[in-house]
């Protein structure tokens, strides 16, 4: 999976226009190390709603390890502590082990998502999500809705601090320091 951790991403095209009262921003990225192109489109209306379309086209003949995740990461202020979502819960679950969880509406805190496994690793994921709200104590924040169910997680840890590659600097979860941020992951697909 190493190629996907640093795919050699390079912006190759960027343009924007205003159409039917919406700002439309298009960007194209070359992912040299994995022989792929990534296309992102942001449609922003005058009410503050943003529709994001993400598409990747890979060279079918490229010899690249399987992709472990396809989605987006958003680093938010730590104060975005409150989570509400409609999906599987209340405990963490992944696509290969989510049948022990119930579909429902859950209200949780980011601080409660991290589970201190002996060996540090990503955790706290939720699947089959229809909508996800990430807000601060005043109720201000963002809501994510997709055309198909998605996965999400929010932690006060960076991905790198939980999985820094083949040479782990920390051997136990208690050695990983909590970051002064909320790291939100919204994924279309993830290996579980």
Where does each model-flagged region fall?
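Beta-strand/loop-rich accessory regions of lumenal/periplasmic or secreted enzymes
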Residues: 1-192
């Amino acid at each position: 999976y190493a190629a996907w951790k640093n795919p050699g991403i390079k912006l190759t095209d960027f343009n924007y226009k205003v159409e039917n009262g919406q700002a439309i921003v298009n960007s194209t990225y070359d992912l040299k190390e994995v022989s792929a192109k990534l296309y992102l489109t942001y449609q922003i209306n005058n009410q503050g709603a943003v529709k994001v379309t993400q598409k990747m086209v890979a060279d079918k003949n490229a010899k690249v390890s399987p992709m472990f995740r396809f989605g987006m990461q958003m680093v938010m202020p730590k104060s975005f502590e409150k989570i509400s979502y409609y999906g599987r819960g209340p405990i963490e679950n992944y696509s290969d082990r989510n049948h022990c969880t119930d579909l429902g509406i859950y209200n949780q805190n980011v601080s409660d998502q991290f589970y201190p496994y002996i060996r540090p690793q990503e955790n706290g994921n939720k699947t089959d999500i229809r909508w996800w709200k990430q807000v601060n104590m005043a109720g201000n924040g963002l809501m994510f809705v997709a055309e198909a169910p998605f996965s999400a997680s929010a932690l006060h840890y960076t991905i790198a601090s939980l999985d820094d590659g083949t040479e782990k600097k920390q051997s136990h979860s208690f050695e990983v320091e909590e970051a002064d941020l909320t790291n939100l992951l919204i994924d279309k697909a993830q290996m579980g």
